[in-house]
């Protein structure tokens, strides 16, 4: 789902991307974890006044690359210095001033979280808070009872879009 979400959001011909581009005057940047770690698309001139969508899974920040998100990042020095000068910098506990998590927090990104049902740990929730998002869209096959569900997609629709890796067997229980 993560790869397909990225592919669709990055495709200028996809209806969702077309709507986002229309609503934000084509000033939209779609980023994933790897883009952020190398600073791709993250500089003062490109982020000024644009909508930034950062697509990740909670697992993105739990491995070695996750720790790198809190470390000094020379690729982001210009952006974080710009954020400080503009009064947009956000301090993130345990993170370097030039870290990816700090740069993203200062941008107040819209965050699309794949497999959000894994976000039960305090560490996962802290990571999400550290991103300082303006909006979070959670994607999950198993929403909690308290979830604010805005859309449902059937298993057949997911299979038709090749978003399910395993065969899906759906049946109705009578009685």
Residue ranges and their predicted role:
Residues 149-175:
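Conserved interdomain linker/interface between the two RecA-like ATPase lobes of SF2 helicase motors
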Residues 10, 126-134, 154-160:
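Short, surface-exposed basic-aromatic patches at helix termini and helix-loop junctions that form
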Residues 34-36, 142, 174:
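Short, solvent-exposed coil/turn elements at secondary-structure transition points
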Residues 50-51, 107-108, 132-135, 161-167:
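Short glycine-/polar-rich loops that comprise or flank the Walker A/P-loop
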Residues 1-113, 117-128, 150:
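SF2 helicase/translocase NTPase motor core
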Residues 115-119, 130-147, 162:
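Conserved helicase ATPase motor motifs in RecA-like P-loop NTPase domains
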Residues 59, 140, 172:
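Residues at the C-termini of beta-strands that transition into short coil/loop
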């Amino acid at each position: 789902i993560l790869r397909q979400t990225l592919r669709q959001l990055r495709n200028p011909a996809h209806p969702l991307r077309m709507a986002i581009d229309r609503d934000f005057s084509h000033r939209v940047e779609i980023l994933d974890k790897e883009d952020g770690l190398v600073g791709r698309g993250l500089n003062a001139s490109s982020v000024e006044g644009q909508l930034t969508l950062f697509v990740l899974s909670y697992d993105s920040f739990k491995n070695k690359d996750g720790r790198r998100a809190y470390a000094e990042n020379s690729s982001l020095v210009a952006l974080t210095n710009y954020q400080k000068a503009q009064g947009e910098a956000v301090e993130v506990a345990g993170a370097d001033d030039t870290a990816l998590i700090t740069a993203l927090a200062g941008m107040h990104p819209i965050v699309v979280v794949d497999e959000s049902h894994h976000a039960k740990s305090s560490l996962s929730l802290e990571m999400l808070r550290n991103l300082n998002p303006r909006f979070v869209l959670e994607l999950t096959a198993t929403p909690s009872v308290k979830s604010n569900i805005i859309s449902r997609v059937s298993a057949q629709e997911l299979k038709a879009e090749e978003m399910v890796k395993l065969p899906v067997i759906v049946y109705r229980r009578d009685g």
